[in-house]
Every structure is written in structure tokens, then in C-alpha cells.
UniProtKB/Swiss-Prot annotation:
Protein name, as recorded: N-alpha-acetyltransferase 40
Lipid-attached positions, N-myristoyl glycine: G2
Coiled coil: none
A GO cellular-component term linked to this record: nucleus
Length: 237
């Protein structure tokens, strides 16, 4: 009986430790989501005036955006990405994409030209993935006239800064394999790695999947196993 009791205590202790670790993860995500403006700590990154561009950048929850700005972001995403989606197993569905982009957890970086014309944006969230606190980048979309001028890279650098300042472990994103320009951009220019949770790494569908999950660790990230033992998903909402 003594041996069984000892094993039971060890299991209970392990469960308590795992729960405490997950509570700590969720506390960091909740703290990040309570911020008024995650970009406030980096005023120098509120402007981008290189390569012929002069734009201002703001960070807001989706609830703080004007409906016209949300409509612009959706329309730009559809223009840039609908064909890519239709070439994947996901397909393109207006309603599902709009619901994703207007979810209460959505944050936005918006780049404005002349303080009035939106020209680029990133939709991101502070969330939990596979037991880790992460900043997940859902979209980075640019109008054609501002591409290839460093603005997209600048927006991703802002995400990395905010992920570090909020103690997230990594920045994550999903990219289609057939979107060769974006894949090369993230892997080579921004040094993102294929995440352990990506289908090609996890053994789930692998070559049959049209996408990869990429990530780049922050100074708070490490190579240890996640708290969730491989289960992917959010917990803080």
C-alpha cells in the first residue's frame, strides 16, 4: 500500500505543478491583453520613414478600430490572399475570415500614410499555443504601393519587440507552402524556424498539408518541452 500511495502522491504533485505552470502562462497572456497599447513602450517604432515611405503606426484592439478600417483590412486580406486560400485545403470563406479578424482577442498594428490612409496592417493575438505563452501573428498585409520597402519587416520587428516586452516565449505564424515569397521572407529574411507543432514536424498530415507553422523565440523562449505535453490550444479565454 505504501508504494501505491507514494505513486499516487507523485502523480498528484505532478498535476499540481503542471496546473501551476499553466496558470502562470495564462497570467502572462492575460496581463498582455490588459495593456492599453503594447506599442506605447516603443515610441520610436510609431514612425517609419525609410525608402520613400512616411507612415505612422498605431496599435489597437479590434474594438478600438473604426468599422471602415476593419472593412479595409478585410478587403485587403481578401485581395491578397483569396487565391492562396483557394489553392489550400482550407478554401476561402468570407464569413469565417471576417469572424477571425473581428474576434474580441484581435489586436492590430495599422500603418497610416499622411495619418489618414491605411496602407498596411498586422492582426495578432496574445495567446497560448501548445502550453506556451505566445504572440500569434494572423496576418501581415500591405497595399501593393508600399511593398518591398521594408515596411513588412518593420511590422514583424514590432511584434517581436512586443512579444519580448510582454514575456511571451515566441512569435508564431502560419504560412502557405505555395506562398513562396512569404515563406522565403519569414524563413530567410526574418530567421523564423519551422515550429515543432507544424504538421511537417509533428507527423500530423505532413506532406499533405499546404501550410507550415513558423516561429521565432524571444529571450524568454527555450527549447524545453511545453507545459501542455504536446496539446495545442488556448486556455485564457
Amino acid at each position: 500500500m505504501g508504494r501505491k500511495s507514494s505513486k499516487a502522491k507523485e502523480k498528484k504533485q505532478k498535476r499540481l505543478e503542471e496546473r501551476a505552470a499553466m496558470d502562470a502562462v495564462c497570467a502572462k497572456v492575460d496581463a498582455a491583453n490588459r495593456l492599453g497599447d503594447p506599442l506605447e513602450a516603443f515610441p520610436v517604432f510609431k514612425k517609419y520613414d525609410r525608402n520613400g515611405l512616411n507612415v505612422s503606426i498605431e496599435c489597437k484592439r479590434v474594438s478600438g478600430l473604426e468599422p471602415a478600417t476593419v472593412d479595409w483590412a478585410f478587403d485587403l486580406t481578401k485581395t491578397n490572399m483569396q487565391t492562396m486560400y483557394e489553392q489550400s485545403e482550407w478554401g476561402w470563406k468570407d464569413r469565417e475570415k471576417r469572424e477571425e479578424m473581428t474576434d474580441d482577442r484581435a489586436w492590430y498594428l495599422i500603418a497610416w500614410e499622411n495619418s489618414s490612409v491605411p496602407v498596411a496592417f498586422s492582426h495578432f493575438r496574445f495567446d497560448v499555443e501548445c502550453g506556451d505563452e505566445v504572440l500569434y501573428c494572423y496576418e501581415v498585409q500591405l497595399e501593393s504601393k508600399v511593398r518591398r520597402k521594408g515596411l513588412g519587416k518593420f511590422l514583424i520587428q514590432i511584434l517581436q519587440l512586443m512579444a519580448n516586452s510582454t514575456q511571451m516565449k515566441k512569435v508564431m505564424l502560419t504560412v502557405f507552402k505555395h506562398n513562396h515569397g512569404a515563406y522565403q521572407f519569414f524563413r530567410e529574411a526574418l530567421q523564423f524556424e519551422i515550429d515543432d507543432s507544424s504538421p511537417s514536424m509533428s507527423g500530423c498530415c505532413g506532406e499533405d498539408c499546404s501550410y507550415e507553422i513558423l516561429s521565432r523565440r524571444t529571450k524568454f523562449g527555450d527549447s524545453h518541452h511545453s507545459h501542455a505535453g504536446g496539446h495545442c490550444g488556448g486556455c485564457c479565454h
